[in-house]
Amino acid sequence: MIEVIFLGTGGIKPTPERNVPSIAIKVEGELILFDVGEGTLRQMEIAGLSPMKIRRIFITHFHGDHYLGLPALIQTMNLWKRKEPLHIYGPENSIEFIKNLLNSGYFAPSFDVTVHELPGKARLQFEKYEVWAFEVSHGVPALGYVFKEKDRRGSFDLEKIKNLGLEPGPWMKELEEKKVINIGGRTIRLSEVTGPKKRGAKIVYTGDTEPCENVIQFSRRANLLIHEATYLNSEDRGESYHTTVEEACEIWKKSKAFNLALFHRGPRYSFKEYKEGATKLCPQAMIPRDFDRIMVKGAEYVIFKVR
């Protein structure tokens, strides 16, 4: 089970209703953060999430509302005597920008902070999941991210076991660990006695972007597309390089992702006003508030939990 926790659903600046962007993905006790707007540490405290559980942080771009929460987060980790390395990923110039942040004030972390600059397209492999980076269109170097849970092996198939003249037993645990074993002089492979692989969850986070073909391509058949929708309509669009609700809904439909969540709401809207307007334009979309959670299990289902 993967848990997506919305720590900040607003954009540009905090409002009394919501904080600026940060999304946590919780998988088997590990926390991965996508963007760290100012105040993210406080949001984590309210959500009951420990900064010490964070192993990786992915920054979409270097506008303040997406990264200015980093110093407070890292200094708190240091105060709590963190020893485990922290890995931060982002677009070009990440090393310079984060180095400048860490050099400000009377502070130096006692643990390793490693910054990885990602090209416009990257695929990172970790033990239980992958993260893919792709370029979006925001007027500055900016990335969207795909979180992809690794596919899991299929269940043991008793019919296949029987057809090989075998009976269920302790050898199954050994086979699960080693993938290939020898029974009675015969080589048995795990793939011979299990069913089809179970597809892992796929979650896409766009960060800030105007309508972008890359989002459609990388969101193909995702369980969940988290797309920015700063404006309810094009008449409200002040600056460029952002998306309206209607545009985000159209991108979602083209991508054939199964579920859509809209975030990065402009500060001009109350939640009530935004939800009413967005629901008329895209009735199927989820409109999360800060601290709402979405539970994703494999490729099977998505549950939206309101705080």
Swiss-Prot record:
Zn(2+) 1 binds at residues 61, 63, 138, 208. Disulfide bonds: none annotated. It holds the Pfam family Lactamase_B. GO terms for molecular function: 3'-tRNA processing endoribonuclease activity; zinc ion binding. This is Ribonuclease Z. The lineage of its organism: Archaea, Methanobacteriati, Methanobacteriota, Thermococci, Thermococcales. The gene is rnz. SUPFAM superfamilies: Metallo-hydrolase/oxidoreductase (SSF56281). Binds 2 Zn(2+) ions.
